[in-house]
């Protein structure tokens, strides 16, 4: 292990490729996570705008977060909804999942759609400054096309949810 941190670890693997060549792979170990596409009764997607230091800008994203040790993904999804947008869902459905960036990390994200939203907040994480934005479903593709939504997990999650819209 090269580094052990609060939310990630870094390790170096030496592998043998299919062509019998030894190669080094640097791997970021990351807990699995959830991403949720919440849709209200008026056909708006509730997104969060928050500052992302590596990108050095505020990004418009779906609510998302890490799955705690021993926590089931659907429980984590409901917790993140309550923490980030102040709602719970009476209709939470798993859409599938995806590897966030399999070239260097083992992070797997479970993607959910949340409907039938009810106010039910939990305290937000101390280090998060989040603003909730309500976006009509029919504007989502334009926001992606014109670079207003640039976060990969958000684009992937919205794409997975589009058949439901």
Q: Which residue stretches match the model-derived regions?
A:
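Unchanged
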Residues: 23, 32-35, 67-152
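Short loop segments at secondary-structure junctions
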Residues: 18-19, 40-42, 51, 114-119, ...
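Residue-level structural signal for beta-strand termini and adjacent loop
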Residues: 27-28, 51, 100
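Short beta-strand micro-motifs in enzyme catalytic cores
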Residues: 9-13, 58, 108-110, 131
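Acidic, metal-coordinating catalytic segment for phosphate/diphosphate chemistry
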Residues: 2-35, 41
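Conserved Nudix-box catalytic region and its N-terminal flanking loop in Nudix hydrolases
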Residues: 34-79
């Amino acid at each position: 292990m090269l580094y052990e941190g609060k939310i990630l670890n870094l390790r170096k693997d030496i592998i043998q490729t299919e062509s019998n060549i030894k190669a080094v792979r640097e791997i970021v170990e990351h807990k699995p996570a959830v991403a949720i596409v919440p849709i209200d009764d008026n056909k708006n997607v509730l997104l969060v705008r928050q500052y992302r230091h590596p990108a050095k800008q505020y990004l418009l994203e779906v609510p998302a977060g890490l799955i705690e040790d021993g926590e089931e993904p659907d429980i984590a999804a409901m917790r993140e909804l309550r923490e980030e947008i102040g709602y719970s869902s009476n209709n939470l459905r798993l859409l599938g999942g995806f590897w966030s960036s399999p070239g260097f990390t083992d992070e797997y994200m479970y993607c959910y759609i949340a409907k039938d939203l009810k106010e039910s907040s939990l305290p937000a994480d101390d280090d998060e400054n989040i603003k909730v934005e309500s976006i009509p479903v029919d504007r989502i593709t334009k926001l992606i096309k014109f670079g207003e939504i640039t976060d990969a997990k958000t684009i992937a999650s919205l794409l997975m949810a589009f058949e439901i819209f």
